[in-house]
Amino acid sequence: DAATLQQVPAQYRPQHGRWIGIAARSTVFVYNPAKISEAQLPHSLMDLAKPEWKGRWAASPSGADFQAIVSAMLALKGEQATLDWLKAMKTNFVAYKGNSTVMKAVNAGQIDGGVIYHYYRFVDQSKTGENSKNTQLYYFKHQDPGAFVSISGGGVLASSKHKAQAQAFIK
């Protein structure tokens, strides 16, 4: 309903108003400042395809979050640039299972940096910080495929038999 939509600033909700964002996750480059300086950070996610990044960065490519990043790259850079990046990625990156594992490896100095969702570091920092104390986050700039933000949203189906309950849940 309109009251629920008004809780979210206009620039962060769809104009048609059929759903609303509930949570957002940013793609970031987590890095270990003891291994890499701010001046050495990749300016773009696309930079990780360059030879100087071989063996220095990690990701968890089997997750839906990473697949969404590739979809964003397709939309922003096109099929050929995405294919070229994926081929270089296969050569350059170290695969880990899960964003937490990537962050832990960066924290331990096993790898210089990695592509993860931002909240993995924030959750760890809110607890002991044990798996992120040696890390920092770098946010890629606007219009870069690495500046991907994933939204979890909700809406009430027109065919719903429980519209009031669904609306209350979303509020």
Each language-model region and where it sits:
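Short amphipathic alpha-helical coupling segments at ligand-binding clamshell hinges
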Residues: 81, 85, 151-152, 161-171
